[in-house]
């Protein structure tokens, strides 16, 4: 099991202008993917509405089938560890969001 840590703003080199809390995310292996998920970004007043994101990793061959709220993301980056995979970082507003693809993907919302 592999985990990714995000430090508190201002700590351990995290200098992103005052946004962010500590977080730990368990990374799912590529053998454990999903084809559809609905996530929710909180509308709480103390959360900056433009700072909601979802990171999506999937096979490059299936990237054209990916839709976030019915729209195909266009900002793919070839995964540095394996050129057969791509990575998307999609900015979200608060509310519910549906991610769907013909092939499996892994998604992390924050």
What are these regions (language model features)?
Residues 1-110:
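Conserved functional hotspot residues at active sites or interaction interfaces
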